[in-house]
Amino acid sequence: MHNGGLIMDKIDINQTEPTVKRSRLFDIFFYLFQWTWGFSVNIVGGIAYLICTKILGYKHQKFGYANIVYMPWKQGGLSMGTFIFMRADHPNKEWTYNTRIHEYGHTWQCLLLGPYYYIVIAIPSMIWCNCFQKYREKNNVSYYKLYCESWANSWGEKFSQMKRIEK
């Protein structure tokens, strides 16, 4: 089956976690850097994760080096270091599949940018998402046109070794 330039039979839309296996040493360094260099982002995400999973009881899962919490909201996704918060039970499985990969890309951006994640990624992303929706619709501009969003897609695919389904 062919869709938008990608061969669909190579994509398992039901795949819920990357199958990438890295060395134990890599794992240690990943979390060491996330929780030192990226501390200011991960501490906020970690507190939100604990509240959402331990107090509110929201469903969650591991996704590569990240933890995804499925939220009862209508929005898309939000990444805070190794913590991803995204809409639960979206009716479109392709959206859920793509959003996991995209938000995972933001996890890796945090690893690179650390405390600069807020000014380079989070703030521009929130402004683009919340203030430019009508502009994007009127001018037929993809949400992923913004540098930090296309970068998240690219890195999400690279580090999960999962391909997004193109629209």
Which role does the model predict for each range below?
Residues I84-R100:
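Short pre-active-site segment immediately N-terminal to the catalytic Zn-binding motif
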Residues D9-I11, L78-A88:
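Short, charged cytosolic
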Residues N98-C110:
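Active-site recognition of the HExxH zinc-binding catalytic motif
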Residues G57-S79, H90, E94:
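N-terminal signal-anchor transmembrane helix
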Residues S23-Y58, I68-K74, Y118-K167:
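Metalloprotease/metallohydrolase-associated module, dominated by Zn2+-dependent proteases
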Residues D9-K21:
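Short, Lys/Arg-rich, polar N-terminal cytosolic tail immediately upstream
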Residues M1-I7:
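Short, Lys/Arg-enriched N-terminal segments with co-localized hydrophobic residues
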